[in-house]
Amino acid sequence: MKKYLILFLVPLTLISQEDALVEEVIVVGTKASLIAAIDKQRESDKIVSIVDSDALGDFPDTTAAEAIRRLSGISIENDQGEGRYVSIRGLSSDLNSIAINGALMPAPEGNRSVLLDGLPTELLDSIEVSKSLTPDQDADSIGGRIDFKTKRPTDLTGELIKIKIDTQYNEQAKSNDNPRFAITYGDKLSDTFGHVLGFTYSSKQIVSYNNETGFGWETNSEGLKELNDDWEMRYYDLTRERLGFTYDANFLTSDVTSIYISAFHNEYIDDELRYKDEYGKLGSIGTTTQSSMFTDRIRHDAETRVREETRTISAFNIGGETIINDWNSEFQLSYSFAEQDDTDNADLTFRCEVRAKKDSCVNLKSPLVSGAVGEINFSNPRKLVLNSYYPEIYDPANLKFKELELEDSIIEDSETALKLDFSKDIEVGGNPAVAKFGLKYRSREVDVDKNKSFYEDDRTMADFNPSQLSWPFPGQVFSQQANPALVYALQNQTDSLTLDGQETYLEDYKTTEDIFAVYGMLTSDLENGVLTYGVRVEKMDMSSSAFDQDGNPTKASSDHTFVAPSINYKHFINENTLLRTAYSRSLSRPSFNSTAPVLELEITGEDIKGKYGNPDLDPYESDNFDISIEYYGNNLSYLSVGAFLKKIDNAIYKTIQKTATINGVSFNDGVETWINAED
């Protein structure tokens, strides 16, 4: 199938100055923005990569993650073709820290990974990725630190108006009403005041078809691969809307004192319809070849999910700079907030299962063909083909109402921080240097409130006006699916259904994390280089509360102190070539989900399984070594070669015990938790 993607871009930048007679229309190309990024990278005293200014809009990037991936050592994890999580040097996104204008971004999922697919590039002026750390940066950055910055009024020379409008056409989508526009207005109203306002809106429809086989592949006694778990075919039809604004203002109150404010707000709405055809409990019998197998069981689930998820990220800063007794003094008070709202989610599953010599949803033929109910061909493991000997499993009248799941969940993550920095020009060994010290206090709170209700009914899919989807992969059968409007309406019809269970507190928890940090550092200009070194100390106190299986509150707490020395050296080999070396210690704290004292249960007959959090987890700790050579040639040519080594202790991973007793609950079918590797 041919696919077409067409983009229409209409950028316009107007800049006027007070002494100009007419307005100028200035087109700033990739060259100008590339010069700015390379200059900043070259002048930095640590190892960084930078995307600057209009380069963010030169490509059809939808999200901030997609803009970052153009930098060396950066990869991203996509969702529905859009960049979502960022990996620095191949490490988990949980091991990064991300900030907007200096305010650390929270993560509205209960972990440390920050979702970036809701953050549009139009709101940003530059992105800086730090791969080595200095003591004035937060230590929780084993992977690295990503700083997003909006346009500052101090960069203005006059009035600025920037407008961008684009759209796209995609043959896969049902609708091509995909507008995206952004406007930036700024003005330096006087020698003492300037401000910048930005606004952006976009809407994009995405349609996708995929096959998923999970981790069900095993090697049998003959050394052949076979699928012994499940396989899914999925269809997505979703619309993603992004709305955001920024406001920055700068006040010069005297020759040595300035105050600034910064506000950032972004809202992301994901309106999703998902059809899923799942074939589970597949068991190999009889002949298995390199490309196929017989199965004595097929569990066919047809699922319709209608969901609208809203994510919000906000950051607010007020700060200033002045001189006190020859010390340049800076302060910043920041508040950041993230929320994930899943209060509009309906998921309905229908099931028809056939099993050899056991109860089935359809009458089995007698005798069975080789004791099998079907055959699976996996000559193409990315696109399996099921030959069911019982096509009745696709009949809506045989697909019985299995379960309706309604979710009403909200996750909130917020952080308040205050930092003070003091620096002064001095001499060390006859060389100019800058002494700097400071302190920072951060208080973070994560509040998870998940509510799920499960319902049963005696109807079949035939009662939900099913329809057949056009499936693009030859040989595969995608069954009919329930009408999504009727599924969505069930949220207001629960009185006519049978309540099968509720989860109102089992996954709920609240965690508070307080971090106090102090640091000292020195930056010395040497004859052929720059040396930056110092130490940072961070003390963390964490407290968390949840509920046990009876609804009684449980509490847990932990604390630790971390010492983080670092040294960065930039050596000038010649006018165009730099050698950089760096050493630092850093950490990454466990996810909130893994440390909260949450005990989740799943009871099936006499079998009890579940998972629980481990408040005693230690953070990842890492010794980081870096070396790189950078060449800056003429005509914007740039070349760098680097290597790094990270020695990471206290790695965190999941473990499963077959039996265990926790908080009075005896598990006999497996219990999952998190532990440190040294344990």
Predicted regions and their residues:
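N-terminal periplasmic "start-of-domain" segments of outer-membrane beta-barrel proteins
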Residues: 26-57, 85, 93-96, 103
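N-terminal periplasmic accessory domains that precede
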Residues: 64-67, 84-87, 99, 115, ...
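Extracytoplasmic beta-strand/coil segments of soluble accessory domains associated
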Residues: 65-104
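Short acidic/polar hinge/loop motifs at secondary-structure boundaries
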Residues: 103-131, 183
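Transmembrane beta-barrel wall of Gram-negative outer-membrane proteins
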Residues: 174-281, 301, 309-319, 325, ...
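Structural signature of Gram-negative outer-membrane beta-barrels, strongest in the C-terminal barrel
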Residues: 252-256, 262-263, 317, 334-336, ...
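Flexible glycine-rich, low-complexity coil/linker segments exposed to the extracellular/periplasmic environment
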Residues: 291-298, 358-403, 449-508, 658-675
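Outer membrane beta-barrel strand-and-loop segments of large Gram-negative receptors
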Residues: 614, 618, 638-679
